[in-house]
Amino acid sequence: MRIVQVCPWFHPHVGGVESHVASLSRELVRRGHDVTVVTSRYDRSLPEREEWDGIHVVRAKTFAVWLRTPVAPATKAVLAGLEADVAHAHSPPPLTSYYAARACDRRRLPLVITVHCDVEVPSALGPLVESAYRRTLEPATLRRATRLVVTTSAYAATSRAVWRYNPEVIPNAVDLRRYRPDVDGRPVRERHGLRADEPVVLSVGRMVPHKGLENLVEAAQHVPYARFLLVGGGPEASSMRRLAARLGVADRIVFAGQVGGEILPAYFAACDVFVLPSVSRLEAFGIVALEAMATGKPVVVSDIPGVREVITDGKEGLVADAVNPEDLALKIRALLADDKKRAIMGRAGRETVERSYSIEGVVDRIEKVYADAVGRASA
């Protein structure tokens, strides 16, 4: 099958959706499908076309990035020029999916849309802009989907956007061949000056407001015997460094910056506890928590829809009130204090990912959605 994945950002841009699309595309290629990723050319130094891990990548001309959204109407022309059996768009940001919906509608190409989270219109734009978006662009995109997918049932039940479209729940997935308990984390500890005998708390994600890193930095005050390893870059990086200095914890927090996907498994292997402190519905799944679980690490995750559905509180990890740094610290301390509990939770996490979130199992379900979409379009 000729499959086109359409997403706002892709390699070398780092993020949860980018990671999911890459894993999905690799597995589809492994199964013999022809996969093209259409994405934005947000950086003009990137090639318009390239082959990456067996995937064709085409980058559409991008005029600007506005409110973290690539403005690339050329996506429509790129899609119009590709031979394809089905397209699969990933949202948000919303414009890319809208471009895909318009292009697929014109050429009667079946379209699957995965809504990874709700679109949050910045309050600074005012309620009229949000109302206009909810009444125009959002339904104009979603109603053109042949099939609609969301990543958790909790998100489907609480989303303002998708519930009326009867979406299918298919979670994000992890490549269990890359994320394994036997990955060696010692080189990462050595690289960042972390002793073998000191507890390490890891968080991975873009440094943007909805990730809740401010609360994690504040929580570090209440776990004075641990080191915190923060992986990722973004507009909040400088303010997080300043906050760490102001709170007197800068010497215990390592800002590792952006890390390439090829070495990311070793970062998970280097930690004792993984924390996902997100505070907003923009984090509707949290694939990094699955990656930590696949590596055999216990996790502390936020008590928000979607994210908390990935674990059973007390089994693979603990659920915390992420807007309360003291509660976050309490859950971190509880895990660091009990080696046996961490080991049991780590094994349980690996088993959960193997059972419900393997890339092979998820792609089995996605292939059925593609086949159904193609069948509906030709009926």
PLM features per residue range, with description:
Residues 142, 258-259, 266-271:
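Short alpha-helical donor nucleotide-sugar binding micro-motif in glycosyltransferases
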Residues 294, 298-301, 311:
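Short hydrophobic beta-strand element within catalytic cores of glycosyltransferases
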Residues 312-314, 318-325, 334-340:
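Conserved acidic donor-binding segment of nucleotide-sugar-dependent glycosyltransferases
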Residues 327, 334, 341-355, 362-368:
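A short, well-ordered alpha-helix in the C-terminal region of glycosyltransferases
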